[in-house]
Regions:
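Conserved P-loop
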Residues: 1-48
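Loop/turn-to-beta-strand initiation segments
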Residues: 3, 26, 73-76, 107-115
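Charged, alpha-helix-enriched surfaces in structured cytosolic catalytic cores
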Residues: 9-12, 20, 51-59, 92-96, ...
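Conserved nucleotide-binding/hydrolysis micro-motifs of P-loop NTPases
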Residues: 10-14, 32-36, 83-84, 118-122, ...
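Conserved catalytic network of the ASCE P-loop NTPase/AAA+ motor domain
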Residues: 20-21, 68-71, 104-108, 130-131
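Phosphate-binding/switch loop-helix module in NTP-utilizing enzymes
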Residues: 34-103
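Conserved binding-pocket/active-site segment within a compact domain
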Residues: 90-111, 117-119, 125
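Phosphate-binding/switch region of NTP-binding enzymes
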Residues: 110, 116-173
Length: 173
């Protein structure tokens, strides 16, 4: 029963979570086709895209108002729209918007996970965004399509510095 906010372009499996956990899972879909992707539910916020960051902020503010009435406890936010926002608004505007959002989420006891494809952006823009967060976890591929997970930084936390192999059969069990 932990409160979770999920911001995405394509909800995929998150649609099921939004339908099953309406009291503690808020889904924010930033997609012009949002109305055809999922039915209207009280915990689903449909935004026309990432072009207007104010629209996203307004939807989040609406969800925060609902959240203020729920019991306190662990909260999580997953922001999967970073790459799309960075492509549309570049580093300065994205960083300004994210700084405000992260501050708001922290003040409401959220742990935030941001998902970004660093290969889509210039290195300076990637670092401008990564520096806003207290940690960095990379998932990458090497030869033979093997995937690895490596924690690059984790503020005020102990962590394993070596990379970990990710095996699909382990994830599916």
């Amino acid at each position: 029963g932990e409160v979770t906010f999920h911001l995405t372009i394509d909800p995929a499996e998150a649609k099921i979570l939004a339908e099953e956990f309406q009291s503690n899972f808020c889904l924010f879909i930033c997609n012009p086709q949002a109305d055809t992707i999922i039915e209207s539910l009280p915990n689903v916020f449909k935004i026309k895209g990432v072009e207007n960051l104010t629209d996203i902020s307004i939807a989040l503010t609406s969800a925060f108002r609902i959240l203020d009435e729920s019991p306190k406890g662990p909260r999580r936010a997953c922001i999967e729209i970073i790459s799309d926002i960075l492509l549309q608004h570049h580093a300065v505007q994205t960083r300004r918007w994210l700084t405000q959002l992260i501050t708001e989420l922290r003040s409401r006891a959220f742990t935030t996970l941001a998902v970004m494809n660093p290969k889509m952006h210039p290195l300076e823009e990637v670092h401008a965004i990564i520096d806003l967060f207290g940690g960095e976890i990379n998932i990458y591929e090497r030869a033979r399509e093997e995937k690895f997970l490596k924690i690059k930084k984790m503020h005020n936390r102990k962590y394993l510095e070596s990379e970990l192999p990710l095996k699909k059969e382990r994830l599916e069990k």
